[in-house]
């Protein structure tokens, strides 16, 4: 529905949702850069968790920074303006999002799930989240490759529900 025919209340609601999405995505990304890029590893977590982070530095850094790529690209990928005015850029960013953010972030998350703080419940939750991202990313990629644009959009938006 275009904004010209969209009821004013719906436009405000949609704008509010978009602003919240951008603020949260960039806020979490900024925190991740600070917590894992500026501060010493594990400085902001429980001491036992810090030991776990230090024991698995490569896994934690790979997961955090690959997932950071997905987090910072996601608001732009949901932009209808970008999709319509710069489709090649949308596709390039989508490939980076999928290849780095979802595949590398998901696989490193699956690896890190074995060492997640919080016992088997934390480990299972972390593993399910990683598998969910990998599965949803694969389905969305398959959808766009087969020309199913709406299924592709639904797949990507499912990652943020």
PLM region descriptions:
Residues 2-161:
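Alpha-helical membrane insertion/targeting regions
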């Amino acid at each position: 529905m275009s904004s010209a025919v969209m009821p004013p209340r719906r436009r405000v609601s949609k704008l509010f949702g978009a602003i919240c999405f951008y603020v949260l995505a960039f806020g979490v990304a900024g925190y991740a850069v600070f917590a894992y890029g500026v501060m010493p590893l594990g400085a902001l977590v429980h001491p036992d968790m810090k030991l776990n982070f230090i024991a698995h530095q490569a896994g934690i850094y790979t997961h955090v920074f690959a997932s950071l790529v997905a987090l910072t690209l996601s608001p732009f990928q949901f932009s209808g303006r970008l999709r319509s005015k710069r489709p090649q850029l949308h596709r390039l960013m989508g490939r980076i999002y999928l290849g780095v953010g979802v595949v590398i972030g998901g696989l490193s998350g699956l690896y890190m799930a074995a060492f997640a703080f919080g016992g088997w419940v934390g480990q299972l939750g972390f593993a399910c989240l990683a598998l969910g991202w990998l599965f949803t990313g694969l389905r969305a990629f398959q959808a766009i490759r087969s020309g199913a644009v709406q299924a592709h959009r639904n797949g990507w938006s499912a990652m943020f529900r």
